[in-house]
Every structure is written in structure tokens, then in C-alpha cells.
């Protein structure tokens, strides 16, 4: 192409005009979402095969052609359609702040100062209402909010999610990461938090919090739309200024005609083509003029009254606030039952331990209500409780043998007898006390009407048979000692009486009775024979 034509001159050879024209057309129409004012200069350099730092005049002419075509392009027209929505968002946020924080808001406030007033009000509210670590963490999120295309961090404590925050962050992600277009069907209700999207506050504080948050979300919507509308023109002007500085060493002139005349001077017959443009040259004040159309307070577009009506009616996004019923009173805890109350004979056991009414408490050693008399003897000796010791009879209180209501075979047949049944003292009728066995006195006498114990011989057979019975019990007691000693002796008996098995090192002796009369079993342990012999002697 040769000759002077209407439009912007591009100092690029004609054989590259096809690829470059398509690239510039995709940017102007907005068909290629990957193109923006910030990266278009790099795309042009790649299209004309210029190395970085070279071809500044060719790139400068291409950027100047895009600059002149931008105001009337379809790309910018779609952004201009969002100017009323941005104005409405700013006006709504401003009027909401005038209603709840009039002392910190004035008609001369900039959007940035309005943002600081809202953040300060929310920070004070979170601290005064709760002040927990989660609230303090949200204070940092509020402080991190910046005007522009930035996602909103966590700013509302004690809530899992907030629909307006999700909407705004999704919009930012679409514009920044996906470089998509905004087709906004603006509705003030979508930027008003619901009652369950704020902490549990008093009614007045809840209205205050929802109003401030609605103002904050409207203001963030304004910042997003403002940057989206003006970003291309500002980025393109910045790139144009940089390449002009690189080509001439001077700052960008005030009039675009200076730049046009400079480029026309480099035109000759084979190194240029023209990009057709309509209208006059685009002034370099275009971004500022565009911003002046966005940052406007227009009361005719204000939606603050609608937002306040939504909040004061107790609804958010059309959802009414439910009325929660009062919780029923918590049931009183029952007192914890004692061990004696949980057993089947708890009442008798507790009265037996307290002693008979009006008398002296009998000498009763510590009793385990579960283990048997014979088998538990080894366990008690091994656990350090000592041998069973029967007190000598006194005139005021009979000797009481350990009572075992559950374990021994005798207990399954006789529910009230565990030991030797001898002459016993009758219990008063006012207290149900288990029969007490006494080994004092003559063993040949037996209380009339008492049941015969299958585990012990009858007292009528005399002391000789009772001594023989005790010797048999001693043998059984040695087996019990071996069973609970940890190592069971297995082997044949040698001539010297020892067995060829291994014996346990566990000492079953009772140090508390090593000095008692009558000696003890071999190894320090006391046998049942010597134990019961105390009462026979």
C-alpha cells in the first residue's frame, strides 16, 4: 500500500500486514480473551519477528493505531455498558455508610477513604462483640482488603461461607485468571449478606454488621468494575509511553498529533501500511476521562433504600429469619451410685461396714465382695494385703470373719453364710446384717437351725476332723500359690523332695506376720492350717 490514506500509519512491511492486522482486529473486537492492554505489545513484537529492544518504531506505530481505534471499538463499548452498574454500586455503598457511620462519612469522601471507614467500623464491631482469636484473625483479613481486582480474604468470623464474598471472588477469578467478560445483571440483593452469614449478634449489632458488610461488598463491586472498565486504556497508554520514551528519549506528548507527525516522517513506499480508523485522534487523557465517568455519585441510581429494607425486615436474599424455640431445661444429673448400691446386697453391705446400731463396730478386715475365700487368699497375700487375721473375741463385739456373698460354692446354696457356722449373735430386727461366724469357744457347739456348710466339716465331728480338713486345705493353698506365682511347677519329685521344674522368684511371704507365734509356712508364707489354729489353741 502506498500513498496517504485516512487512518493510522503502521510502519511494518506489507508482507507482515496480514498477521498483524488479524492480531489487532482480535484485540479491538475482544474476540481473543487472552489479549489485554498489558500484553498486546509483546504479541505485536512476536507477530513482526522483532527481537526485544529492537523495532521500537514499528511497535510504536502499531500501538498508536490501536490507541486511536480503542474508544469506538467493540471491546471498549462492552465495558462502557457497565459504567451505570459501577456508579450504582458506589452510590449505594456511600449512602449506606451515611446511614450507619455518618460521623466517618462525608459527601467529599473518595472510594478509598470510604473503604477505610467501613473496615474500621467492622474491626471495632468484631472486637467489641467477641474478640476471640478467630475475630482477631478476621481483623487481619479486613486490613488486607485493597481497592482493585483482588479477592476478598476471610473477614467474617464464626461463619463458614458468605454468598456475596463467593460471588465477588468468582468474578475476580474470571477477570484475572480466565480473562473473561463481565455480563452483570446487577441486583443489590446478591450483595446483601443473609442473617446466617454473619456472627450471632444482638438485633441492633446484626443490622449494623449486615449494613456495613453490604456497603463493603458494593464498594468492592465498584472497584472490580472500575478496573475492568479502565484497565485496557491505562495499560495501552503505559505501553505507548514506554516505547515513545525508548524511540525518542522524551515523555509522551500532551497532543496525539505530535506522535502522528513523528511516525509519518518514517513512512516511505515499502515499509508501511495503514489501519483504517474512524473519528479523530484519541486524546491521551482518555483514561482519566473514562475514570471520571465511573467515579460518580448519582442518587437516581442508588439502591441503598432497597438494601436497608431487606436488612430491617430480617431477610437476606429473600429468605426470612426463622424464630428458634427455647431449649428445654437440661435434666439434673443423678448422684453417682456407690459400689455398695450397685451390688445386689448393697444395703446390707453398707450397714454391715457401719456396724450394728447402738453397738461397737466389729473388727472387719478389708473385704473384696467378689473373690472366694480360698482362691483369693493367694491373691491377697501376693497383692500385699496380708494374711487373713481373725481378732480374738471381745465381750462387746464378736469377731467377724471375712464375708463373701458371691464367690464360694457355699454362697450359691446359702446366701447368708460363707465361713464356719458357729454360735453367732442375733442381729437386731432394725438392721439386716449378714450372719457373723465366730471361731471362738468350743467348736463342738453349733447354733440350732443353722445350715450345714459343705466346704467345712461339721463341728460335731470334733476338732480332729477339723485339723485334718485344714491340712488338706494347706495342700490346696500351695497349689494356688504356684498358680498365681507366674511360673507353674511341672516335673517329677526328686528323692530330696524337690521338683525338677523352675520355681518363681515371687515372694509370697507376708512380712506383716513374720513375727507371729506359731511360725509360718516354708518360705515365709502362712498356711491356712496355722491361720485357723490361732482360734483353736
Curated annotation (Swiss-Prot):
InterPro entries for the chain: Herpesvirus_BRRF2-like (IPR008550)
Biased composition (Acidic residues): 492-517
GO cellular component: viral tegument
Keywords tagged on the record: Virion, Virion tegument
Biased composition regions of type Polar residues, renumbered to the chain: 334-347
Stretch list, region Disordered: 325-474, 486-537
A Pfam family recorded for this sequence: DUF832
Record-stated family: Belongs to the lymphocryptovirus BRRF2 family.
Name of the molecule in the record: Tegument protein BRRF2
Bias type Low complexity, positions: 423-441
Subcellular compartments: Virion tegument
Amino acid at each position: 500500500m502506498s500513498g496517504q490514506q485516512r487512518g493510522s500509519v503502521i510502519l511494518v512491511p506489507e508482507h507482515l500486514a496480514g498477521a498483524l492486522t488479524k492480531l489487532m482486529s482480535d484485540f479491538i473486537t475482544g474476540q481473543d480473551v487472552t489479549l489485554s492492554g498489558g500484553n498486546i505489545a509483546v504479541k505485536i513484537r512476536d507477530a513482526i519477528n522483532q527481537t526485544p529492544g529492537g523495532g521500537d518504531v514499528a511497535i510504536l506505530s502499531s500501538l498508536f493505531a490501536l490507541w486511536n481505534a480503542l474508544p469506538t471499538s467493540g471491546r471498549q463499548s462492552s465495558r462502557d455498558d457497565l459504567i451505570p452498574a459501577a456508579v450504582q454500586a458506589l452510590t449505594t455503598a456511600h449512602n449506606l455508610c451515611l446511614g450507619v457511620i455518618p460521623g466517618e462519612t462525608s459527601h467529599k469522601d473518595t472510594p478509598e477513604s470510604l473503604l477505610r471507614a467501613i473496615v474500621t467500623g467492622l474491626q471495632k464491631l468484631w472486637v467489641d462483640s467477641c474478640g476471640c482469636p478467630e475475630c482477631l484473625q478476621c481483623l487481619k483479613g479486613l486490613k488486607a482488603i485493597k481497592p482493585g481486582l483482588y479477592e476478598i480474604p476471610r473477614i467474617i468470623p464464626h461463619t463458614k461461607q458468605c454468598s456475596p464474598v463467593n460471588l465477588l471472588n468468582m468474578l475476580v477469578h474470571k477477570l484475572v485468571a480466565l480473562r473473561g467478560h463481565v455480563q452483570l445483571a446487577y441486583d443489590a440483593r446478591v450483595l446483601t449478606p443473609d442473617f446466617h452469614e454473619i456472627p450471632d449478634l444482638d438485633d441492633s449489632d446484626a443490622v449494623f454488621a449486615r449494613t456495613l458488610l453490604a456497603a463493603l461488598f458494593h464498594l468492592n463491586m465498584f472497584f472490580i468494575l472500575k478496573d475492568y472498565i479502565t484497565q485496557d486504556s491505562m495499560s495501552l497508554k503505559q505501553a505507548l509511553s514506554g516505547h515513545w520514551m525508548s524511540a525518542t528519549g522524551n515523555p509522551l506528548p500532551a497532543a496525539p498529533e505530535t506522535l502522528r507527525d513523528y511516525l509519518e516522517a518514517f513512512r516511505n513506499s515499502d515499509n508501511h501500511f495503514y489501519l483504517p480508523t474512524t473519528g479523530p485522534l484519541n486524546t491521551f487523557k482518555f483514561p482519566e476521562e473514562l475514570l471520571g465517568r465511573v467515579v460518580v455519585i448519582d442518587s437516581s441510581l442508588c439502591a441503598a433504600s432497597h438494601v436497608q429494607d431487606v436488612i430491617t425486615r430480617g431477610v437476606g436474599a429473600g429468605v426470612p429469619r426463622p424464630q428458634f424455640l427455647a431449649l428445654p431445661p437440661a435434666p439434673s444429673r443423678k448422684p453417682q451410685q456407690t459400689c455398695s448400691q450397685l451390688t445386689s446386697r448393697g444395703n446390707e453391705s453398707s450397714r454391715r461396714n457401719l456396724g450394728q446400731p447402738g453397738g461397737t463396730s466389729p473388727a472387719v478386715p478389708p473385704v473384696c465382695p467378689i473373690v472366694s475365700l480360698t482362691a483369693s487368699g493367694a491373691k491377697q497375700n501376693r497383692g500385699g494385703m496380708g494374711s487373713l487375721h481373725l481378732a480374738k473375741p471381745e465381750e462387746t463385739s464378736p469377731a467377724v470373719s471375712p464375708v463373701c456373698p458371691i464367690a464360694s460354692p457355699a454362697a450359691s446354696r446359702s446366701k447368708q453364710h460363707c465361713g464356719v457356722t458357729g454360735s453367732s449373735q442375733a442381729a437386731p430386727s432394725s438392721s439386716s446384717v449378714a450372719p457373723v461366724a465366730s471361731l471362738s469357744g468350743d467348736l463342738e457347739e453349733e447354733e440350732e437351725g443353722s445350715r450345714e456348710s459343705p466346704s467345712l466339716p461339721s463341728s460335731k465331728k470334733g476338732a480332729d476332723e477339723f485339723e485334718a480338713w485344714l491340712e488338706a486345705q494347706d495342700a490346696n493353698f500351695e497349689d494356688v500359690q504356684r498358680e498365681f506365682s507366674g511360673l507353674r511347677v511341672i516335673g517329677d519329685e526328686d528323692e530330696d523332695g524337690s521338683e525338677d521344674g523352675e520355681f518363681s522368684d515371687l515372694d509370697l511371704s507376708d512380712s506383716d506376720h513374720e513375727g507371729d507365734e506359731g511360725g509360718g509356712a516354708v518360705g515365709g508364707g502362712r498356711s491356712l492350717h496355722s491361720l485357723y489354729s490361732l482360734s483353736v489353741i
